[in-house]
């Protein structure tokens, strides 16, 4: 399997928020993360493996300094509204554990917070608009732990 120059450009562009938003896609890197994405409710659009596309191509599409053996392009879920108060207001008055975040700018910190929130069974996480994008490659990577 080969990868075209256009595919490389598209996957590489997903390291920037504006392209993730425009295309409705994000990347997941690493064997474990790709396997988890494939078992999850997320729609995996395409999986790239180093043994199939080659090390050079993998290093071109990876956002990591040391590319992992696999990378998946995943569709952002449509049922998560990251820019509206509607999700927050629908949760008010309901019981459960909720976490509110204010201005988390470091992607690694946000990923760690999300991983720990999941472990503790937090039902929903709300973040201020100026919080780093949850689909930032470093946030996604940090959720793995």
Protein language model annotation of sequence segments:
Residues 17-18, 61-64, 88:
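Short secondary-structure boundary/capping segments
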Residues 24-25, 45-46, 69-72, 96-99, ...:
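Structural motif
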Residues 8-11, 34, 58, 67-70, ...:
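A general structural signal for well-ordered alpha-helical segments in protein cores
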